[in-house]
Amino acid sequence: MGTLILVAGENGSGKSRCAENIVAQTTGRRYYIATMQPCSEENLRRVEKHRRQRRDLRFTTLELPHRVGAAAVENGSVVLLEDVSNLLANVMFECGGNEESVYGDIEALLSRCRILVAVTITGLREDGYDGETAAYIRALNGLNQRLLARAAAALTMKDRQPFAEKGELNEII
């Protein structure tokens, strides 16, 4: 069973760069699981920015909008999962899945990794939303809490600075 490191923060907080920096300190085979399905110009720009950022990090990139538990990763590898919020949205809105199915998928992936660095969005509130959007926000907040409880280490990004919420990275990587 692998070690989970959770990197959380609001949009634009620097969480992706932080996660990439963590993975850059590791040895062995590295995978980048991209879950975003770019459907707007802004999303396409974000995907391109992330590709440029990780160009020199020797990742094997896997584009998987869902079913990350079945990802073709080498046992004992290091995996960056970018990101949990997109994965959950894809599973809920395209596949009829839920928080539980995503958590199980992440656990299945984690069982084959040495280290899994999972990126997620925090700070979303249900206020002003109803229906599917409110259900998604509740599910994401619940999933984030479960991942935080499961993680050996967790960082929260604020003003592009990482703050340790749990564990010691130096003991893991």
Go through each PLM region and give its residues.
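Short, glycine/serine-rich, charged loops/turns that create anion-binding
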Residues: N11-G12, Q37, S85, G123-L124, ...
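Residue-level signal for inorganic ion chemistry
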Residues: A19, H50, L80, I121, ...
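Helix-adjacent hinge/juxtasegments
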Residues: R52, L57-E100
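Conserved P-loop
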Residues: G2-V73
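Short, well-ordered alpha-helix to beta-strand connector turns
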Residues: T27, R58, G76-S77, C113, ...
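Catalytic phosphate/metal-binding cores of nucleic-acid and nucleotide-processing enzymes, i.e., regions
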Residues: M1-G2, E74, E107-L110
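Generic beta-sheet signal
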Residues: T3-V7, R30, S77-N86, I115-A118
